Amino acid sequence: MKTVTMRVTGLVQGVGFRWTTQMIAQELGITGTVKNNPDGSVSIVAQGDELPLEHFIKKIKASPSVAAHVDHVDLKIIPNTEKFTRFSVVY
């Protein structure tokens, strides 16, 4: 089990990015959260087995929403301090 945080910049708010991210996470068995930030970026905490997590990260970098455009993903591996049971959108 591995946990990463991602800060995604670009056109990622108001375009279905969080909803699509949640759908992809659920398809891959990834748990965690996704939320909008005041600066226009999106923050993701994703937790899962290594291979599904790698697929999830690739899909995020490729912009999961048709209307979105990802400019940059700041990715960090963090300690598994919290165990998520599902993937949810934080409002």
Curated annotation (Swiss-Prot):
Domain Acylphosphatase-like: 3-91
Keyword match Hydrolase: yes
One Pfam family, short name: Acylphosphatase
A Gene Ontology molecular function term of the record: acylphosphatase activity
Reactions the enzyme catalyzes: an acyl phosphate + H2O = a carboxylate + phosphate + H(+)
Xref: InterPro entries: Acylphosphatase, Acylphosphatase-like_dom, Acylphosphatase-like_dom_sf, Acylphosphatase_CS
EC numbers: 3.6.1.7
The protein, known as: Acylphosphatase
